[in-house]
Design a protein with these regions (language model features):
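Thiamine diphosphate
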Residues: 34-36, 85-262
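Conserved thiamine diphosphate
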Residues: 1-116, 125, 141, 246-254, ...
Length: 262
């Protein structure tokens, strides 16, 4: 069902009838964040924060066709309850079908020492566009596509943050409170890492209803927003234009005109 109807209306049943007895129930929430035009009544902007707080639950988020195809067998392999934040409709295939989603293991999309960028869900496509241009400007990026929000203990992420030059940026289709940015902030604090963190996420507010593209721009969770945060971290302007981002070829598996209906 819609993510909002699942975690808002049935939270007591989920907590007492699934989480508390630690039952192997797999809960799917569709159309998260700004992926639905239905406005505040239909937009799940804080579902990760809520579901991460439930004992025993594992939390996944999908971002492309490969994630969607491979998350079900992965969820079934987990003995306890699982929440899957699921995109649907026309989806890009950003990763080859053989590159399946893994528990508590982010995909490493690019490697570099200047910045660490962690993106999730629909924001990864936007981040990939920006990272392509950044690499062309000699800014090296360690870019992770995060699909497990709980647990959040991937040692590759911790190592990258420890060794980055300028800092860390998170990018997500969720409120700034309790989502991917919070996961990373907790990781930095727990390991006493002296690293700057910039969050790209939805502000602590309810949203308008409109198209996904319009809302990503309006609420600053698109490629332009990522470039602006990079400029803040490195302390200089990059003069990257909209046409530069639009022309970025992000992956050989992506074809905007042949998105897959899943």
């Amino acid at each position: 069902t819609f993510s909002v109807f699942m975690y808002r209306r049935a939270l007591d049943q989920i907590e007492m009838s699934i989480a508390y007895p630690n039952l192997p129930v797999k809960v799917f929430g569709f159309l998260p964040g700004i992926t639905t035009p239905g406005g505040a009544s239909h937009q799940a902007i804080n579902d990760i924060a809520v579901m991460r707080s439930l004992p025993n639950f594992i939390v996944f988020e999908t971002g492309d066709a490969t994630d969607v195809e491979s998350v079900i067998p992965l969820a079934n392999s987990v003995p306890g309850p699982v929440y899957i934040r699921m995109v649907r409709g026309a989806l890009p295939r950003l990763f080859p079908a053989s590159d399946k989603i893994k528990l508590d293991k982010a995909r490493i999309l690019t490697q570099g020492e200047d910045l660490v960028i962690l993106s999730s869900g629909i924001c990864t496509e936007e981040a990939m566009r920006a990272v392509e241009i950044l690499n062309n400007r000699n800014i090296s990026v360690n870019h992770f596509h995060v699909t497990t929000l709980k647990p959040f203990t991937d040692p590759e992420i911790l190592y990258a943050i420890k060794n980055t030059k300028f800092g860390v940026i998170t990018m997500e289709n969720h409120t700034k409170i309790g989502g991917l940015g919070t996961c990373v902030a907790e990781l930095i604090a727990e390991h006493c890492l002296n690293k700057k963190l910039k969050k790209i996420a939805l502000n602590d507010t309810y949203l308008h209803g409109a198209s996904k593209r319009y809302l990503m721009k309006k609420y600053s969770i698109d490629a332009n927003a990522l470039i602006a945060k990079v400029e803040e971290l490195i302390g200089r302007k990059l003069y990257i234009l909209n046409k530069d981002l639009a022309s970025a070829r992000i992956d050989t598996y992506f074809n905007e005109k042949q998105q897959e209906a899943l």
